[in-house]
């Protein structure tokens, strides 16, 4: 029996799934471009393929840099109860209170977003087209991760409540089933963020507050589905894999009041607004003369190394799921 259970677990997780999934990170950056003003669109839209493709680079980097993993999450419940007043919102204050090792152990995503915002603002100010596109693509990744409830709690894959696999279910399986056919990505336009720290921490607290619901609803619905109804076998990339069934996913997303769609829409808006804010803070430099030329030899080698290490499949530090 134990061997059979292990076999099914391997089938269920045979496709590596990352934060929001590669597919959804690409979609979030893609849709964020269309919320930008024309002065930014002139650079971002022609390079929408680059911004989408390289949205997943931070996940790939977890395979070559041990420190990368902590940039994707925050085990906020380690620091007490909602609204987690014990955590200083300022990074330097948090360092003095908890130490770098503690912060690294329990995640630094809200502070890392602010660091990446500083990098993007600098790139805009210097009119460095390669840095603008690279930093914008990667900033979008971290912002999107902060909108995932299971990235903001220690029970990040249901491992503490016998719900292993819920992480990939929420952020990959559900979006892949419904995003293209049912979800609405007409969101409006990007807005300037006057206080970045307040904005990011508000999103962090939203995710933290939703984590319990993500877990409890899955457990509740599971009581009404037999195992053969909850899961289904599908062909994927030439392999038979065990997935959550469409019927179960539909019931779950409905029970969550379409939370996954709402968090994705919020991610798109936040990514676009952060890009826009960085540009405004840099003095709104004209971007019409910037074109994204071919990658330099060193840039090409960096991306090739990322892809090579990712394909090896050995993440350093804590895995996302």
How would you name each of these model-derived features?
Residues 1-4:
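Positively charged n-region of N-terminal signal peptides that target proteins for export
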């Amino acid at each position: 029996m134990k061997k059979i259970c292990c076999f099914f677990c391997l089938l269920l997780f045979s496709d590596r799934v990352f934060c929001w999934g590669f597919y959804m990170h690409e979609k979030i950056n893609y849709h964020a471009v269309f919320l930008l003003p024309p002065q930014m669109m002139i650079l971002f839209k022609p390079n929408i393929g680059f911004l989408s493709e390289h949205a997943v680079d931070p996940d790939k980097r977890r395979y070559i840099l041990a420190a990368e993993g902590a940039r994707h999450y925050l085990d906020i419940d380690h620091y007490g109860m909602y609204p987690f007043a014990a955590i200083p919102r300022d990074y330097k204050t948090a360092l003095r209170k908890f130490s770098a090792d503690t912060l690294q152990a329990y995640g630094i995503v809200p502070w890392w977003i602010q660091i990446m915002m500083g990098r993007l603002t600098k790139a805009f100010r210097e009119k460095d087209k390669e840095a603008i596109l690279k930093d914008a693509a990667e900033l979008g990744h971290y912002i999107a991760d902060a909108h995932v409830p299971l990235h903001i709690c220690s029970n990040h894959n249901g491992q503490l409540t016998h719900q292993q696999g819920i992480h990939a279910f929420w952020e990959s399986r559900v979006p892949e089933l419904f995003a293209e056919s049912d979800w609405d990505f007409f969101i409006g336009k990007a807005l300037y963020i006057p206080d970045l720290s307040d904005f990011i921490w508000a999103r962090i607290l939203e995710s933290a507050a939703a984590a319990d619901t993500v877990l409890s609803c899955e457990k509740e619905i599971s009581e009404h589905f037999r195992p053969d109804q909850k899961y289904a076998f599908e062909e994927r990339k030439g392999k038979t894999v065990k997935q959550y069934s469409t019927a179960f996913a539909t019931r779950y997303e409905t029970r969550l009041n379409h939370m996954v769609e709402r968090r994705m829409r919020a991610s798109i808006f936040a990514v676009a607004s952060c890009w826009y804010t960085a540009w405004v803070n840099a003095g709104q430099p004209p971007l019409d003369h910037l074109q994204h030329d071919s990658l330099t030899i060193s840039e090409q080698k960096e991306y090739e190394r990322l892809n090579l290490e990712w394909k090896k499949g050995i993440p350093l530090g804590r895995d996302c799921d």
